[in-house]
């Protein structure tokens, strides 16, 4: 009865102070009926990133017996018989082969560990693939950074080229403006020269008309002189002056005087015209100088304003280029920050994924351990139930044997009945313990279900996070593709602009090449104009000479007129004298008709006087001939000047034609300049469109950065939620583990109480059953055998401890093994 009762009370060793256990492996040693059963459970967990090792070991021994070294048996005989006629109680100890055969190395199989290792290998492969993907992404990011740097360098080179192009365009615009001003000056000078030529032509026509009038007057005076000459010649031939001759002389004299007066008037008008011409020329020169100075001042002001505008435009362009460079730098910084944040987010997410996978693996291992512990609890409950059944059967047998053997000892029977009642109470306690174990099993099942649910939630969160990561990666790829497209479009635009700039360069070179002969022609035209001006000046000098000659001729004509007046006066005097002489001669002829001898003297005197008059007439004729020669020289000179004027007109017409050709070329150049200005406007429009596209791309980048920021915030919030959930699950698991530890402690207290009760029962049994020492000796032998098995198990456990200590090293597991209650147990004295 005592053996059965001692076999029916299993022992639960107290756990260590660290208390957190996880069951992974199980070893149950069963003996036949009456043999002690030892259940050894042990676990280990291979954690990731500093996870602790949790081990629970429980050795259940029925009774406490003296220590016996392993491999030795008791000194007493194997079989002990207690004979009492007419009954015989035979006790056979269990064979060591059965005990040893129960414990096998196959029970220490690591199939679950292999499956866990497979999962861990899979996770490692996944992590390696993720790390490879991260490495690829990093390399891509580096390549993108290199491409961005190359693009930046290319853009800077293109900017420098654009600045050079802008500088050259400014130079070409300046040259074009200078050409325009020169062409305008040429046009103005041309118009001014045309007006001058028209005015000179009008003045020339006026002078020519006045000269023609003067020539006509001179010719009329010459005719009158010739008429006087003829009349004087007639008078010579006739030698007698009639009234008609006198009248003709007087008439010719009057006509000559009229012609001379008209000649004087024409000379005066010519002098007035020449004076007016000189005054006009002086005033025109002054006006031209004043207009040229005003034009120069206006041109200087316009050049100053244009240069100021160009400086302002260049400053604006420089500011715009600086703003573009700053925007591109900000974009590069934002892109680098985005790439860095994406890399950090990737690393953070990968670390979180690894931690989640490690936690999932740990939770799976914990779930498996819980399942194993549940199965162990079930097996333990079944073993306890079987032991209870065996104990009941054994108790019934013992009762029957004791009733048959000890009928006389009623007191012992009553005591045994009381003991049986106590055993029934213990059985009830065991039933309660089984119920509690079942409740704990149900709680573990609920916990397992909750853990499975949490695992599913975590997997869903991981899937969502992976989707977000893929979305972010896709968004980054789309952004990079857009940036590449924008960069390609900018490069294409730059190529187009360079091609257009080269075309502009060629056109400018062609225009310059065409401008050189135009400049030569313009210089030739200027030289011709200067030659014309010099010829005009020469003509003016000639006109001055002619004026001086005309003045001389006027003076000579005045002298001739004075001489003619003198001659007229002398003629009048002579006529009067002749009349007087004729009258005197008549009177003398009448008075001295008789004096015929005096007539030849008078004739000689008259002949001498006539000879003198003829000499005077010849002198006058000579003077008239000289005057006619002078007039013919003047006519020849005027004709020569007319030829020169015609040559000048022809040259002027040729210069006008050349000026027309030059104006046509200038118009073509102006058209080309207008085309270039239109192309410049188109370039400005293209640049404005490019700036608008850049601004739109900047806005898109800002939107994408905002979206990335919102996504990063969402990721951070999701990660924080996952962390909170994981912490909550950890806290929940810790609380459950603490509750389990508390329950284990309660069970240990109950076991200690049962142990104390058993010790009291043993004392009472020893005090009451001293007579049954033989049976007690048998029981002691059996207990020694069980103790030997326990010691062998302890040695095996010690071997396992040393092996696990060698495997796991120093740590909480070794401290737990050293603090195990099995080692501290000492054999009874």
From Swiss-Prot:
| Keywords, in A-Z order | Cell projection, Cilium, Coiled coil, Cytoplasm, Cytoskeleton, Developmental protein, Differentiation, Flagellum, Isopeptide bond, Microtubule, Phosphoprotein, Spermatogenesis, Ubl conjugation
Modifications after synthesis and translation: Tyrosine phosphorylated. Phosphorylated by TSSK4 on Ser-95.
Task: Identify the InterPro entries for this entry.
Answer: Odf2-rel
Enumerate the Gene Ontology biological process terms. Answer: cell differentiation; centriole-centriole cohesion; cilium organization; protein localization; regulation of cilium assembly; spermatogenesis
Cross-link named Glycyl lysine isopeptide (Lys-Gly) (interchain with G-Cter in SUMO2), where? 138
Residue positions, PTM Phosphoserine:
73-74, 95, 106, 109, 115, 129, 139, 261, 632
| Localization in the cell | Cytoplasm, Cytoskeleton, Microtubule organizing center, Centrosome; Cell projection, Cilium; Cytoplasm, Cytoskeleton, Microtubule organizing center, Centrosome, Centriole; Cytoplasm, Cytoskeleton, Spindle pole
Tissue expression per record: Testis-specific (at protein level). Highly expressed in cytoplasm of step 2 round spermatids. Detected in the middle piece and extends to about half the principal piece of the sperm tails.
Superkingdom of origin organism = Eukaryota
Name a single GO cellular component: centriole
Residues covered by region (Interaction with BBOF1) = 537-701
Q: Where is this region: Disordered?
A: 392-413
Molecular-function GO terms, alphabetical: small GTPase binding; structural molecule activity
Query: What residues bear Phosphothreonine in this entry?
Result: 92, 110, 231
Q: What is known about its subunit structure?
A: Self-associates. Associates with microtubules and forms a fibrillar structure partially linked to the microtubule network. Interacts via its C-terminus with PLK1. Interacts with ODF1. Interacts with MARK4; the interaction is required for localization of ODF2 to centrioles. Interacts with TSSK4. Interacts with AKNA. Interacts with QRICH2. Interacts with CFAP58. Interacts with BBOF1. Interacts with CCDC38. Interacts with CCDC42.
Q: Which family does it belong to?
A: Belongs to the ODF2 family.
Q: What does this protein do?
A: Seems to be a major component of sperm tail outer dense fibers (ODF). ODFs are filamentous structures located on the outside of the axoneme in the midpiece and principal piece of the mammalian sperm tail and may help to maintain the passive elastic structures and elastic recoil of the sperm tail. May have a modulating influence on sperm motility. Functions as a general scaffold protein that is specifically localized at the distal/subdistal appendages of mother centrioles. Component of the centrosome matrix required for the localization of PLK1 and NIN to the centrosomes.
The protein's name is Outer dense fiber protein 2
